Regions:
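Acidic-and-aromatic substrate-binding clefts and catalytic sites of carbohydrate-active enzymes
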Residues: 2-7, 61-67, 89-91
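Gly/Ser-rich "nucleophile elbow"/oxyanion-hole loop immediately N-terminal to the catalytic nucleophile
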Residues: 2-35, 51
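Alpha/beta-hydrolase-fold catalytic nucleophile elbow
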Residues: 32, 58-59, 83, 117
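Short glycine-enriched nucleophile-adjacent loop
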Residues: 38-49
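A conserved short beta-strand
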Residues: 50-63
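Short, proline-enriched alpha-helix->beta-strand connector loops that line the catalytic pocket
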Residues: 74-80
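C-terminal catalytic histidine-bearing segment of alpha/beta-hydrolase fold enzymes
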Residues: 83, 89, 105-170
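Short alpha-helix in the alpha/beta-hydrolase fold that links the catalytic acid
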Residues: 92-104
Length: 170
């Protein structure tokens, strides 16, 4: 139904951390997560867009039919980089990430990226993983391409997901 019993607790945790850690730059708060963590990433950005400098939902599970056009506009205001795999057996990419990406684009998102993979293969050992494990590529700093297959660049330089995150601030 688009709600979460965890949202207020997670928001309170972030608020408390920022309040008690003065050395944290509140203009550079990033949020990301995998699967249900990706759901919570979308949920928190949708409800508190002013809090986050950028987001990176990975194999996010938020059904887009539960997201209003007004909420999409809020999401589009925050730089976002989606990561997902076409053969994800857990989350239907067509009713979550792809649809949300397209709706955010239509809503005018200017700093929007999407690394989409056909399968998840460990680059070091060649093992093939469940398609839901898209975080393998993000954790190995391998998310560098956009939805159309082009390289993501900042100021003419190719960047990975984490380098891109560091370029964003409120």
């Amino acid at each position: 139904d688009g709600s979460s019993v965890y949202e207020s607790s997670l928001k309170s945790l972030i608020d408390e951390y920022l309040r008690t850690h003065e050395n944290v730059d509140a203009n550079r708060v990033y949020i990301g997560g995998c699967s249900n963590g990706g759901y919570m990433t979308v949920k928190l950005v949708m409800d508190y867009p002013e809090m986050f400098a950028a987001s990176f939902p990975i194999c996010e599970a938020y059904k887009t039919n539960l997201i209003s056009d007004e909420e999409v506009v809020k999401l589009a205001s925050v730089p976002t980089w989606f990561v997902h795999c076409v053969n994800d057996p857990v989350v239907d990419i067509n009713t979550t990430a792809i649809d949300l990406y397209e709706r955010m684009k239509e809503a005018g998102a200017e700093n929007l990226h999407f690394s989409l993979y056909d399968s998840i293969v460990d680059p070091d050992y060649g093992n093939t993983y469940n398609g839901h494990f898209a975080w393998v590529y993000s954790l190995k700093n391998l998310c560098t391409t956009d939805y159309d297959g082009s390289n993501v660049t900042v100021d003419g330089n190719q960047v990975n997901l984490y380098q891109w995150l560091a370029t964003n601030s409120k």
